[in-house]
């Protein structure tokens, strides 16, 4: 059929079909077996694939009211003519295509099951079918059949034929291949050629019974709803608000009653024992809340700064330091104003062997149990051991616990407390999580951060993922630095240098000599790098690395050899929690040295030992205690240092009255040491008289680097609470960011020590001291009128509350007060007098 005849047929046929009166068949005609015009598909009609029909939105049956029976009229195996298409049309269809072979594209083009079900009981709608066919069988020129408006198609409503028969499962189903426009079939491509044999199967889905309507569909939808409800849908997820939330600790202040609300019992007791009056609490309510939160955070955990004031066994990490005695203790009963009894050597647990001054009287606090875990105020009397930083600051070099004076060892600074592995100024140790408690005094390992190692001192965010990142950064950043440290160690031990065995037995008393293996070197480098790596917002810090890791790192930095064969005539001058301090003489030079022996198994913070060694190794200066060497001897670590026989400045200020020129000389030497540390990016953070050592000649040197922290360009401020409370700068107490200027404030407080014999607020409890530092700012000086104007001006610049306005070490070294400095040998008489007074005090107490 050519295009012209087809076009005329396309536009003429619907009109003749739709305007023709429907045949006058009754419902019985549909069931007649003699019907010659069946709706079965003609053998030559093409079969289209189910997939193309199923994917088409248009291929849906249109419901009609023409049939009201429960099954479609097309499902009846009737021989009668179609009620809509006359017999003439059917005859035309047969005549046109009886001789034409079936197109090769024989995939069945039928309605999906759902559409099939919808057709059941619906009348045959030729208009909807034609629309679907036109959509799928359109020719390349996009010509499509546009059915006339329904108003023009139907001039008479077709009769409502109703079938009285039951559906036959094998009956013909409505198929998109049924059409009255055979030419359209030619629009489909002939993929296999026109000579493809015709498929003799007339009904492509004969074997598939028609799905019965009714309950089965509702069951299916119900089942689907049930499955969806069980599996859940992303869109349906709803997160409810928390139920019955409970705020365990929420402190507030009631302005009407002037009372704090929600105070835990421990806080209430601390406030009662602190000596802070109700009026003071009402005047600065927010400051009180901040201090209590600060105090609570630092008073918990196994390395608390406040626990260093408690009475507890030193080996217990969470226990408070046994140093502080109950209120009635004779140890602290006397004021430091009486030289014979006031200066007190810290107990063994205090890592440093300096002579701390007598602790302040306990404000109306009842004597505290020796092993109290909570730090009652009375037990908080500081032994002058600096606290460890609680919060995580990037690149924080952990500081070891503050010095503890054992017997009268001037090396309290070489305290047996675990010397932190403070990195050399170039290293920055991993930051300590903000939640990390300050070190207890007994531990004196006040290390803020763990040694860097594979197990990293930092908190693991996603612990494993963060740790991996840190370890990767570790191995690269500090390669050169680690080599530098190793070379320095070798150069210092040239005389004793000997080949080391491959392995070093841990349990043997003598340290076998063995060169660090590549693994050890890599581990050391990794640990150093870890310190330099910036820390993410720290969660709680991980458990400290095991003893084997620490030993491996120590092996890499310690000198091989047996120290017992290198030093002789050891004389114990002090005792710490985990070891003692000895004087000894070197075999080849007969020089007197100080040796700090530490039992690694007794160190609460083994990682911190490396911190101090590294800082001292890299800080060679005339005003910094000289680190000589370190050895591993069995289970002990021996740290050999320069011996400062004069002891600490604490004894000098306790038993003597110093003149301004002498004070100026001490300040100048201290500032020189600080300037050197600051130039390397290191903050000491624990400057006080206990950490200033003197020789008999009056030479002055800084010691106790356990609290040192690393700062750099990217992290030039810290916000961790470190140092002993009485020497803390206001920005540290209020937990603001701070930098090098905190050492300048501590120097100013130490100058007041040299004037008055003790720092401000020493007779106050630590909690009240924190309150006074935060609220008063620059402390008042007794008898300030007796000071020279130049000295007052020096103190004014050193004790500025605003760190931005506070002078630097470089500025103070140029201050006119430095012109008053006395020669260092003028300090020698003070040192000797202090030694005599100390010996007398010890004799009165029965000798220690």
Curated annotation (Swiss-Prot):
Q: Which EC main class describes this enzyme?
A: transferase
Q: Name one GO biological process term.
A: sterol import
According to the UniProt record, one GO cellular component term is:
mating projection tip
**Which parts of the sequence bind ATP?**
573-581, 596
Query: Which segments show compositional bias classed as Low complexity?
Result: 101-110, 467-482, 524-537
Q: Which reaction does it catalyse?
A: L-seryl-[protein] + ATP = O-phospho-L-seryl-[protein] + ADP + H(+); L-threonyl-[protein] + ATP = O-phospho-L-threonyl-[protein] + ADP + H(+)
Query: Does the keyword Chaperone feature in the UniProt annotation?
Result: no
Main subcellular location of this protein, as a coarse class: cytoplasm
Task: Return the Gene3D superfamilies for the record.
Answer: CRIB domain, Phosphorylase Kinase, domain 1, Transferase(Phosphotransferase) domain 1
Q: What is its EC number?
A: 2.7.11.1
- Cellular localisation: Cytoplasm; Nucleus
Catalytic residues as annotated in Swiss-Prot or TrEMBL: 686
Residue span(s) of domain CRIB? 239-252
Annotated region (Disordered) at 1-227, 315-548
Q: Where's the Protein kinase domain?
A: 567-818
UniProt biased composition (Polar residues): 29-38, 63-80, 161-180, 315-339, 409-427, 440-454
Q: Does the keyword Hydrolase apply?
A: no
Q: Which domain of life is it from?
A: Eukaryota
**GO molecular function annotations of the record:** ATP binding; histone H2BS14 kinase activity; MAP kinase kinase kinase kinase activity; protein serine kinase activity; protein serine/threonine kinase activity
Positions with biased composition (Basic and acidic residues): 133-142
Q: Which UniProt keywords apply?
A: ATP-binding, Cytoplasm, Kinase, Nucleotide-binding, Nucleus, Pheromone response, Serine/threonine-protein kinase, Transferase
A Pfam family annotated for this chain is Pkinase
Family assignment from sequence similarity? Belongs to the protein kinase superfamily. STE Ser/Thr protein kinase family. STE20 subfamily.
What is this protein's function per UniProt?
MAP4K component of the MAPK pathway required for the mating pheromone response and the regulation of cell polarity and cell cycle.
The protein, known as: Serine/threonine-protein kinase ste20
Gene that encodes it: ste20
């Amino acid at each position: 059929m050519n295009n012209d005849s087809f076009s005329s047929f396309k536009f003429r046929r619907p009109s003749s079909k739709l305007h023709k009166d429907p045949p006058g068949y009754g419902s019985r005609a549909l069931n007649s077996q003699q019907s010659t015009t069946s709706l079965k598909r003609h053998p030559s009609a093409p079969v289209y694939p189910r997939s193309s029909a199923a994917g088409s939105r248009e291929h849906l049956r249109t419901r009609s009211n023409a049939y009201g029976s429960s099954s479609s009229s097309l499902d009846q195996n009737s021989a009668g003519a179609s009620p809509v298409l006359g017999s003439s049309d059917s005859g035309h269809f047969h005549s046109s295509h009886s001789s034409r072979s079936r197109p090769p594209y024989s995939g069945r083009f039928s309605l999906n099951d759902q559409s099939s079900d919808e057709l059941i009981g619906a009348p045959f709608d030729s208009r909807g079918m034609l629309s679907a066919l036109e959509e799928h069988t359109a020719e390349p020129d996009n010509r499509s059949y546009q059915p006339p408006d329904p108003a023009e198609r139907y001039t008479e409503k077709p009769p409502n034929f109703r079938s009285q028969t039951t559906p036959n499962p094998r009956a013909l189903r409505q198929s998109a291949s049924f059409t009255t426009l055979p030419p359209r079939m030619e629009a489909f491509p002939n993929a296999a050629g026109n000579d493809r044999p015709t498929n003799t199967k007339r009904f492509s889905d004969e074997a598939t019974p028609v799905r019965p309507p009714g309950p089965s569909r509702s069951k299916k939808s119900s089942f689907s709803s049930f499955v969806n409800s069980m599996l859940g849908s992303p869109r349906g997820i709803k997160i409810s608000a928390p139920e019955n939330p409970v705020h365990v600790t929420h402190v507030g202040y009631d302005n009407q009653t002037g009372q704090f609300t929600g105070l835990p019992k421990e806080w209430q007791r601390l406030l009662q024992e602190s000596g802070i009056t109700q009026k003071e609490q009402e005047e600065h309510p927010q400051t009180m809340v901040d201090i209590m939160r600060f105090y609570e955070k630092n008073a918990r955990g196994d390395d608390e700064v406040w626990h260093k004031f408690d009475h507890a066994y030193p080996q217990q990490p969470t226990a408070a330091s046994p140093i502080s005695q109950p209120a009635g203790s004779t140890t602290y009963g006397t004021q430091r104003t009486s030289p014979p009894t006031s200066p007190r050597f810290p107990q063994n647990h205090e890592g440093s062997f300096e002579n701390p001054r007598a602790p302040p009287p306990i404000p109306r606090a009842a004597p505290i149990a020796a092993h109290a875990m909570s730090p009652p105020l009375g037990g908080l009397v500081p032994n002058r051991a600096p606290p460890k930083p609680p919060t995580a600051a990037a690149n924080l070099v952990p500081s070891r616990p503050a010095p503890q004076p054992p017997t009268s060892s001037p090396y309290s600074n070489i305290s047996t407390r675990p010397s932190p592995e403070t990195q050399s100024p170039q290293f920055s140790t991993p930051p300590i999580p903000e939640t990390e408690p300050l070190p207890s005094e007994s531990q004196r390992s006040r290390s803020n951060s763990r040694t860097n190692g594979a197990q990293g001192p930092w908190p693991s965010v996603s612990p494993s993922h963060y740790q991996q990142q840190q370890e990767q950064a570790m191995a690269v950043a500090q390669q050169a630095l680690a080599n530098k440290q190793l070379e320095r160690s070798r150069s210092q031990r040239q005389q004793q240098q000997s080949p080391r065995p491959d392995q070093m037995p841990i349990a043997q008393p003598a340290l076998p000599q063995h060169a660090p293996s590549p693994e050890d070197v890599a581990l050391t480098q990794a640990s150093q790098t870890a310190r330099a790596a910036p820390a993410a917002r720290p969660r709680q810090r991980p458990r400290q690395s095991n003893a084997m890791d620490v030993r491996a790192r120590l092996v890499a930095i310690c000198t091989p050899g047996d120290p017992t064969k290198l030093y002789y005539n050891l004389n114990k001058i002090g005792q710490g929690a985990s070891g003692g301090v000895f004087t000894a003489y070197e075999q080849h030079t007969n020089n007197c040295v100080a040796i700090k022996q530490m039992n690694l198994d007794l160190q609460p913070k083994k990682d911190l030992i490396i911190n101090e060694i590294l800082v001292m190794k890299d800080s060679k200066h005339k005003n910094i205690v000289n680190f000589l060497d370190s050895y591993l001897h069995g289970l002990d670590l021996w740290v050999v240092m320069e011996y400062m026989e004069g002891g600490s400045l604490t004894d000098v200020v306790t038993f003597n009255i110093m003149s301004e020129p002498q004070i100026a000389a001490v300040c100048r030497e201290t500032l020189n040491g600080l300037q050197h540390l600051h130039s390397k990016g290191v903050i000491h953070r624990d400057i006080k008289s206990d950490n200033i050592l003197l020789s008999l000649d009056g030479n002055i040197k800084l010691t106790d680097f356990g609290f040192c922290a690393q700062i750099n360009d990217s992290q030039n401020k810290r916000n961790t609470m470190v140092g002993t409370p009485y020497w803390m700068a206001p920005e540290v107490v209020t937990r603001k960011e701070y930098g090098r200027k905190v050492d300048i404030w501590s120097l100013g407080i130490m100058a007041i020590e040299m004037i008055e014999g003790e720092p401000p607020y020493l007779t106050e409890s630590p909690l009240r001291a924190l309150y006074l530092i935060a609220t008063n700012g620059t402390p008042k000086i007794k008898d300030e009128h007796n000071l020279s104007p130049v000295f007052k001006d020096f103190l004014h610049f050193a004790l500025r509350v605003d760190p931005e306005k506070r002078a630097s070490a470089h500025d103070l070294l140029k201050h006119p007060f430095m012109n008053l400095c006395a020669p260092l040998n003028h300090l020698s008489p003070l040192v000797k007098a202090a030694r005599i007074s100390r010996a007398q005090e010890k004799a009165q107490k029965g000798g220690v």
